Amino acid sequence: MSKLVLILNCGSSSLKFAILDPATGEEKLSGLAEAFFLPEARIKWKLNGEKGNADLGAGAAHTEALNFIASNILTDELKNSIAAIGHRIVHGGEKYTQSVIVTDEVVKGIEDAAQFAPLHNPAHLIGIREAFNAFPHLKDKNVVVFDTAFHQTMSEEAFLYALPYSLYKEHGVRRYGAHGTSHYFISREVAEYVGKPADQVNAIICHLGNGGSVSVVRNGQCIDTSMGLTPLEGLVMGTRCGDIDPAIVFYLYKTLGMSMEQIEETLVKKSGLLGLTEVTSDCRYAEDNYDNASKPEAKRALNVYSYRLAKYIGAYMAVLGDDHLDAIAFTGGIGENSAHVRELALNHLKLFGIKIDNERNLAARFGKDGVITTDDSAFKAIVLPTNEELVIAQDTARLCF
């Protein structure tokens, strides 16, 4: 068996894991451990096509999950083939523009950036520490891949906020973006799709899932992206509000008497599609009930969602200026599967000569890629499944093998 990479994506209460062959992209194992610290902590996995699941024990967390993976799921052959471990890290601040091997200095850098990702970075550090314990022979073969790295090519005019400049220089307050690993992967997929070298492709990439972001790529490099200092800015998301008037925070605090904790919970966990429907954060509810007159919240939510998305796409078309736009790409759970969202958003962009092909749009779902615009559309729109795990595996292999 060839050299394999174990990929870990640690959240505060969950752990996604996979084992990939970085040379072929073949997935040997995938799984999810969830409900950490709760009585129902559990783990499920798929190994060589066979599915399994187990209880981890009440209160179990990252340590128990990784120990279970190493002791109960991995075969000896698979365990011996793991040559390195790749970790997804949400925020690397300005310091990290590419993936790096884990050192004490890197751990310190992840800790420093935790102020901008307080839920994610501390959990990632737990994952690194527990990986050291579970696989001690691979301690110098751990690699971190940053969601923010791809966006570090943005210029000041794109990443600065119109705040006192000292807030940036002294405290790092600026746009960082997120989903960079996915945006990077899709930019390369677009290049292959349109037959151009990766360093010459110009694209607008819409990563739409429970979280969502748009980036604009010129000559293979990100020049702007919708998420900001944190992943709260930008698009309407599952539970996150995206762009709002900052003075709304003052209003909620001063006039409605909400605490800062309540305001944060509202903007991060109670807004977006959940806030607009007041039912669910699941986009499928809004799609399924879009024309149901008894559930007007569905149409309201999907219209606001798609309108915001169209605004970003249009703005980024302007940002490209004279550079030819090779494609608008849709990826992520919603981007890959919601023909309705794509149709609503692109129909706002008829001014640019974009024409959606309804049959192609409906065909490009459920894992199928494809162009969804007509042959005479001024610009192509493409659906492309993302593969962040493959990027992590390949970066890890590049640094360790």
Swiss-Prot record:
EC assignment: 2.7.2.1
Main location group: cytoplasm
Domain of life: Bacteria
Site location (Transition state stabilizer): H179, R240
Pfam name, any one: Acetate_kinase
One annotated GO biological process: acetyl-CoA biosynthetic process
Localization per record: Cytoplasm
Entry keyword annotation includes Metal-binding: yes
Entry-linked CDD domains: ASKHA_NBD_AcK_PK
Listed Gene3D superfamilies: 3.30.420.40
Binding site for ATP: K16, H207, L208, G209, N210, G211, D282, C283, R284, G333, I334, G335, E336, N337
Cofactor descriptive note: Mg(2+). Can also accept Mn(2+).
Keywords assigned by UniProt, alphabetized: ATP-binding, Cytoplasm, Kinase, Magnesium, Metal-binding, Nucleotide-binding, Transferase
Quaternary assembly: Homodimer.
Function: Catalyzes the formation of acetyl phosphate from acetate and ATP. Can also catalyze the reverse reaction.
Family as reported in the entry's similarity comment: Belongs to the acetokinase family.
Name of the molecule in the record: Acetate kinase
Organism annotation: Haemophilus influenzae (strain 86-028NP)
Source species taxonomy: Bacteria, Pseudomonadati, Pseudomonadota, Gammaproteobacteria, Pasteurellales
